[in-house]
C-alpha cells in the first residue's frame, strides 16, 4: 500500500495530529513526539503517512546498529555524505534539521534507546531543536524514563490504539471494494486478533480470496461458517 493510498485509520490520524502540533509548537517548548505500542498496531503505516504529509526524514532502526551506523543511516536519508567522527556526524544531522525545518521520524527506536546510542538522540535534539518523532514498542516509555535528558524533552506521548471496528470496515472497503464484508464478520475478526492491524489485514485477504473462490459478492459471519480466523497461533496438529 503506497503512502498515497493509506487509509486514514485511528493511529494514522493520531500521529499526523501529533506531528502537526510539534511542528507548529512555540519555540520554548520541547519537540519530541513518541508513539508507542504493540507490534502490528499500524505504527509504521502511520509513520509513512506522517512522513509523506510533512516531508519528514524517515529512518527505520535495526537491532544490530551502532551509534555510527545509526548516524550514517540518517545522513544517507538526508542525502549527505557522512564525515569521519561521531561528533561531526551529529553536527551534520542537527544542521540539516535546523536548516530544512523538516521533522525526522525514527521508527523501531527501541533498538537505539536500549543501547548507548540513545545519547545520540539527545545530542541531535539539543543541537538542532528540531522535531523528532520516535516510534517504537510498548517498552519505549519505560526505557526513556531512565534517560532523563531525553525523557523531559517529550512534548507528546501517543499510545497506539488497537484497531476499532470502524478501522476494520474502512480497511476492508478500501482494500477489497469488490467484496462486501459484513460488520458481524469484521467484528469477529477484530475481536479474535485483539485489534492487531497486521493480523486483520491477513484475515481480510483470506476472506477476499475465499470469496473469489466461491463467487461470493457478500460475506457475513454465517457464510464464513467454521472457516478459521488467523490469530497468529499455529493450527493444532491433526491426529
Regions found by a protein language model. Name each.
Residues 1-17, 40-49, 54, 149, ...:
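C-terminal alpha-helical "lid" subdomain
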Residues 27-47:
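Walker A/P-loop nucleotide-binding motif
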Amino acid at each position: 500500500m503506497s503512502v498515497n493510498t493509506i487509509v486514514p485509520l485511528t493511529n494514522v490520524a493520531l500521529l499526523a495530529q501529533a506531528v502537526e502540533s510539534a511542528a507548529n509548537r512555540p519555540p520554548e517548548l520541547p519537540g519530541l513526539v513518541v508513539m508507542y505500542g504493540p507490534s502490528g498496531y499500524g505504527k509504521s503505516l502511520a509513520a509513512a503517512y506522517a512522513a509523506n504529509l510533512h516531508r519528514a526524514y524517515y529512518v527505520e532502526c535495526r537491532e544490530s546498529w551502532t551509534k555510527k551506523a545509526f548516524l550514517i543511516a540518517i545522513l544517507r536519508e538526508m542525502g549527505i555524505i557522512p564525515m569521519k567522527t561521531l561528533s561531526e556526524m551529529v553536527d551534520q544531522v542537527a544542521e540539516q534539521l535546523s536548516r530544512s525545518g523538516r521533522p525526522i521520524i525514527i521508527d523501531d527506536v527501541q533498538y537505539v534507546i536500549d543501547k548507548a546510542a540513545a545519547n545520540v538522540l539527545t545530542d541531535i535534539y539539543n543541537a538542532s531543536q528540531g522535531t523528532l518523532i520516535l516510534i517504537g514498542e510498548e517498552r519505549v516509555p519505560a526505557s526513556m524514563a531512565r534517560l532523563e535528558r531525553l525523557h523531559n524533552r517529550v512534548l507528546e506521548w501517543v499510545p497506539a490504539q488497537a484497531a476499532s471496528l470502524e478501522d476494520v470496515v474502512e480497511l476492508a472497503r478500501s482494500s477489497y471494494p469488490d467484496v462486501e464484508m459484513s460488520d458481524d464478520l469484521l467484528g469477529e475478526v477484530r475481536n479474535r486478533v485483539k485489534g492487531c492491524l497486521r493480523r486483520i489485514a491477513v484475515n481480510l485477504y483470506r476472506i477476499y480470496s475465499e470469496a473469489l473462490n466461491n463467487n461470493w459478492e457478500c460475506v457475513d459471519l454465517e457464510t464464513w461458517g467454521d472457516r478459521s480466523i488467523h490469530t497468529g497461533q499455529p493450527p493444532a496438529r491433526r491426529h
